[in-house]
Amino acid sequence: MDKILSDSAMATDDIRILISYALWSQWGQIAVEQEGTARAVRAELVAQHRHGQEPAPAMLTELLASMVAISAAAHALDALYGQLVTPAIKKDGPKDDKGREAHIRECLKRRFDTGKRDREWVSRFQRLFDLRDAAVHAEVKSLPAVPHPSGVSNAGQVNADYSAEEAVKAVDLMLDVLNTCVQNPKPSDAEAKAWAVGYGRAVETLTTELRVSRDARPLVIYRG
């Protein structure tokens, strides 16, 4: 036994174990969880307002959860690009002065049959990455108050931009992209087909978690 163990130890001296992570799955999980938090806090916000309580603390919590959900959804799509992009796609893709979202969509279009979905994604990708970039590269601006999407009061523009509604849209886009890719790998792309098989369960799990969360806590607004 000692000899076997000794030989095994020596045999593994030159073996390297390589581990990789597709971080879009982790970012996707964060996005789904924080979108759920934003919706749950929205319900508290509306209830507090209905019973005459100060809504500002809940509004702030919704803002924070929505910022994380929106950013995480964008990070998930960015990480998906990082997993799927090839040197050829980088070489032939959009020019460097194009936004990150354009590079992501081009990569997906090259590896999956996105069809009409790609055209439908243009404005949604733009909105998501505008919000992500504005949060990461924030500027201080004095802007007029606007109605908060909850309907309880006016608030700062940032509260409207990073609201539960925007978090819902961000996560919807993320899962729309993931499900479209899982279901439509290009027949000629063996690696894309293998990706769809290998990650289909992860996408299904995220999608189911979101559906359960939304059934349990729908997004609400104050209706007076």
Briefly describe each language-model feature range.
Residues 3-6, 19, 25, 35-51, ...:
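Polyanionic, low-complexity intrinsically disordered segments
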Residues 2-98, 123-126, 183:
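Amphipathic alpha-helical interface elements
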